[in-house]
Amino acid sequence: MNADQIRGLKPTLTRYLKRFDDCFARCDTRAHLPVYVGGQLSDLPAKSCEPIALAAGVAPRTLQEFLSQHCWDEGRMRDRVQELVVRDHAGPNSIGIIDETSDVKKGDKTPGVQRQWCGKVGKKENCLVTVHLGYATGDFHCLVDGDLFLPESWSEDRGRCRAAGIPNEVVYRPKWQIALELFDRARGNGLTFDWLTFDEGYGSKPLFLQGLDDRGQLFVAEVPVTFSCWSEAPPVAHRPYRRGGRGRSRKTPRLRCDAPAPMSVKDLLKHSPALRDQPWVRYLVKDGLKGPMVWETKHTRIVMKNAAGLPGIELHLVVARNVLDP
């Protein structure tokens, strides 16, 4: 869309934003929302507070205070967005996307900032990270939730958290746990996904995969080549036993002595007859700007090694390689 088309949508945008009026306690605070959202949708080269405010003819400090000091009900706004998506865009073939965003930040005052992996620049950098849940169906897509990842170093320093305005109830949670909470909130508001998809940052976490399976959610996950699994479920002993005939009986399940060790996906591809002897199947994924993207794939069933080291859920494994860019 060009700038004229966006400006032509102003009446529609105004009506849409009116649906969030009850999320603000004060009318003067509420009035800044159209200014900020309109600036984000504009063709301004920079979309921070100052250029947005100057373009709208308001004082930059006013818009800065709107974002940093004024109060609104964030939870109600999030729930309202999800309810509108359910009402207007629910349908078949809906996909949920779990992903994270990292923003490079200088200094050490911004909540959650520290030197950590920054996907935006592809290396460790001083940045903050947020975990997001997106929704897509047909030609519609939007973000429906997100939350800040608070590193352990921050969580353990409550004085630093208070100085940054982080409430006491906000503590360190692994990113996969944040993702499950986003998913549960969306489901609680009636939003459903035919499939959920995410990269290996989440696909490598057995507790996350198990959590989705426990909730009955289908998913397509990227997993690393080190992902640990079996080609078929190994035998497990459930009866109590004593190690060496001494001590207290152990009652938790364990792998039987004759159980095979789990294998990485990389080793499974090399050594498992189910994959090793299977021919590659070629697919044209898409025609890109640099030419066609062609993948070759193999498929088999595997049993995931869970967080306790025991056989977990059964999964379909699709191994893919890029033929033209190996």
Residue ranges and their predicted role:
Residues 14, 138-164, 168, 224, ...:
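An anionic, glycine-rich sequence signature occurring as long contiguous blocks
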Residues 28-30, 35, 39-108, 244-284:
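Electropositive nucleic-acid engagement tracts
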Residues 8-9, 159-178:
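Glycine-rich phosphate-binding "P-loop"
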Residues 69-152, 157, 162, 298-305:
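Active-site-proximal, Lys/Arg-enriched surface segment
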Residues 1-25:
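Basic, low-complexity segments
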Residues 80-85, 170-194:
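Short, basic/hydrophobic alpha-helical segments
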Residues 93, 188, 208-218:
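Short, surface-exposed basic-aromatic patches at helix termini and helix-loop junctions that form
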Residues 197-205, 225-227:
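Acidic, metal-coordinating catalytic cores used for nucleic-acid/nucleotide bond scission
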